[in-house]
Amino acid sequence: MTNVPETIRKRVDSLRATLEDHNYYYYVQDDPRIPDAEYDRLFRELQKLEAEHPELATEDSPTRRVGSSAETSFEEVIHRLPMLSLDNAFSEDELRDFDRRVRDRLGADGAIEYVCEPKLDGLAVSLHYENGTLTRAATRGDGYTGEDITANIRTIPSVPLKLRGSGYPDLVEVRGEVYMPRAGFEKLNERLAEQGEKTFVNPRNAAAGSLRQKKSTVTARRPLELCAYSMAVTDESVLPETHWDSLQLVRDWGFRINPEMRKAEGVEACLDAYNELMAKRDSLPYEIDGIVFKVNRLDLQQELGFVSRAPRWAIAHKFPAQEELTIIEDVEFQVGRTGAVTPVARLKPVFVGGVTVSNATLHNMDEIRRLDVHIGDTVFIRRAGDVIPQVVKVVPEKRPAEAPMVEMPEHCPVCGSDIVQIEGEAVARCSGGLYCPAQRKEAIRHYASRKAMDIEGLGDRLIEVLVDEGMVSTVADLYRLTKFQIASLERMGDKSAANLIAAIDRSREPVLWRFLYALGIREVGEATAKGLAAHFGTLEAISAADEETLQTVPDVGPIVAGHIRSFFDQPHNQETLAALKEAGVTWQEEQVLSADEQPLNGQTWVLTGTLSGMTRDQAKEKLEQLGAKVAGSVSKKTACVVAGEAAGSKLAKAEQLGVPVLDEEGLANLLREHGIEV
């Protein structure tokens, strides 16, 4: 052994202790004490020192958590104490029977105290420590023989490589569940999908697959955690009197124990714990499939003993399954209120997640292709809480011969309009926006909104009633409504009806860009609508333009041009436009000005304060007619600030930067000078 300076030895020991402390606070206590960058700096320093002085490297060093590229053989391990499974209870009656058996066997008249632990949906493991250092880790296997996974377990940050504190026995075994949190599972699957690799069906499979990687470097990159649930020692004199206290001891040694764990006196309290945990099941950051009840006193556990392959002093009360197998009998396509066309699997009814499920979403055609779904397939269905049931995996070996593939229809199943899918988008959509009954309410809501036709008093609830009562089918029908019809509706009197009819009448002569925006063409917002109106001047010119011509308008690319062209190509939409004209809706043509003819072209203006003669939106609209871009903040590039009453920080900043300022009268004069009505 070479002579390593004592200062180096002490620094290595100090770094190891510091890093393990921070691992403990970060991964076990969820209480980070230093920034990630500082942890990384200390970690790299330890790596460097161990590389320079290999004789200082130890098996319990934090640097061992990064894993090794050497392949693991998973040698057989015989458990000194069998890792027995638990009996299950699937109903309240079965749990009551368990409690009765416990009390009868113990001859107990009163209630038994139990420890209630969430049953994590992961992989059970056994960890052996000698003199406080992790020496071996193994899977449960068949309960008597498991596999050596020591190299992979070392990579899990919440597993102590060396026990904390002092006073622990020379030999100790800690058992726990390795699991993958929901957030980590989702990120892992996203990464695997991006790399073109096979994704995991659920977090449990992901945890099991990650723990059995032949190269521990792969395991090190997987977001695994460990939660301890029991301990065993050769010298039982060091054990506390209860299971609860033994877990507190395990926690003091540096392990994470479940914060949802609690004590319960008697079976009724156990049932309360079960119901409370089931209610919050879907909000937990990890998946659980039940709750484990254990007799708390260790002497009573010993008296109760074991039967066959399970202890008499514990039982797992399982939650309703969240995944089940069933068969896809058909696939139908639904149209949402925004026109999204979604494939829905019609299933052979199956009880899952506490309810009978006969439908499940397939999301889109990309997902159907990824899963390789055929009609007649046997599939795994998953339902968690209020989440819509979904197909998560196909069992291809059970596929019937000549099972048909799922194909996207060419026409909307509701209105018959073309179904379009823009390249690069996962969602296909019905192009019959103004006409399609499935999109009716959303189309009317958008048409009446303040930034579109601004029909005051026509809110969501009234739109629901008008459509549901059959009084309105398209936006054109709004202009055929009468005061009598409106007044006859619940909670609508004569005055409200008169006000609404007046608001509808006021919307008959919109400026072109507002009408264009009101049509609800996909991805045509206010700015794009203004650009189209200014460029073409008339709705007829816009509706006749091909995609190439449409793309000459600023901010209109191939995708938006495709949406515009698709909208005007649909006969149903043209019929609705004709009906609007017939109902007396006319839109003002815009004077088409070249950039040179727009006096404020290329300038950025800012509005601040209160204007008395017009609203801020009206002022913005008039400035945009002159070619200005109206921004929300002042900078050196601002051409001018219009300051109304009670102008605040924007005015102060303009004065500080030397930006010209106009009052409301100055703005009015500017607009009149260029022929804009004030």
UniProtKB/Swiss-Prot annotation:
EC number(s) recorded for this UniProt protein: 6.5.1.2
Reactions this protein catalyses: NAD(+) + (deoxyribonucleotide)n-3'-hydroxyl + 5'-phospho-(deoxyribonucleotide)m = (deoxyribonucleotide)n+m + AMP + beta-nicotinamide D-nucleotide
Disulfide bonds: none
GO CC annotations on file: cytosol
NCBIfam families named in the record: dnlj (TIGR00575), PRK07956.1 (NF005932)
Biological role stated in the UniProt entry: DNA ligase that catalyzes the formation of phosphodiester linkages between 5'-phosphoryl and 3'-hydroxyl groups in double-stranded DNA using NAD as a coenzyme and as the energy source for the reaction. It is essential for DNA replication and repair of damaged DNA.
Identification of the protein by name: DNA ligase
Organism per entry: Marinobacter nauticus (strain ATCC 700491 / DSM 11845 / VT8)
Phylogenetic placement of the source organism: Bacteria, Pseudomonadati, Pseudomonadota, Gammaproteobacteria, Pseudomonadales
